[in-house]
A protein has these predicted regions:
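Compositionally biased terminal segments of proteins
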Residues: 1-191
Length: 191
């Protein structure tokens, strides 16, 4: 994958810290998700956006808190997230109902507290990140490259049987596991 522009990545991290601080100040539970959650554990840098997981009942309040802090809110047509734009148009996704099921107290409790870019925060487990990404694969979005890169860079840290078990109903997940096993990135299923 091409190298991520350092300035853009720095802007993502700054936006993550600002948004996280705003949500903390508002008393909203959240966890870092997506590509930045993987990066926080040694995965590749991301160039897309900042994914913050919040419970469905907190999503609108979280977006309002970000708006009050100067971020530009947006309500997309998808019914599983809200958005806000930070400085330099960095996109903050407030995800409350990702593939794999809505964000719950259990999801947030499973997240580990880590120091990311000099800020303590909850970071979603890699298994949860991968479940969400693998279940998002579809006929319209069949790109395996990012989930292959995550598997390659973080394979030793992932409970692959957990990810398999939670994604087994998806034909795209079956294709993904066939591929990563054939490439010897991930061990074959232990069942």
């Amino acid at each position: 994958m091409p190298r991520v522009d350092e300035e853009s990545f720095g802007q993502l991290l700054d936006a993550m810290k600002k948004a996280g601080g705003v949500l903390n100040d508002a008393g909203i539970r959240w966890a870092l998700g997506g590509g930045l959650a993987a990066w926080a554990r040694g995965g590749p840098e991301t160039e897309h956006d900042v994914d913050l997981l919040v419970k469905p009942e907190d999503a609108e309040r979280a977006q309002q808190a970000l708006a009050e802090a100067g971020m530009r809110p947006e309500k997309p047509p998808e019914g599983w997230l809200l958005k806000a734009y930070a400085d330099n148009d960095v996109l903050i996704d407030l995800i409350f109902d990702p593939q794999g099921g809505p964000v719950s107290d259990e999801t947030l409790d499973r997240a580990d507290e880590l120091e990311v870019y000099a800020m303590r925060m909850r970071v979603v487990r890699l298994e949860d990140v991968l479940v969400q990404k693998v279940l998002a694969l579809s006929e319209q979005e069949p790109d395996f490259s990012s989930v292959l890169e995550l598997a390659r860079s973080l394979r030793e840290q992932v409970d692959w049987d957990d990810v398999r078990g939670r994604t087994c109903s998806s034909p795209f997940a079956k294709a993904y596991f066939t591929l990563v096993e054939a490439l010897e990135i991930v061990p074959a299923a232990t069942r």
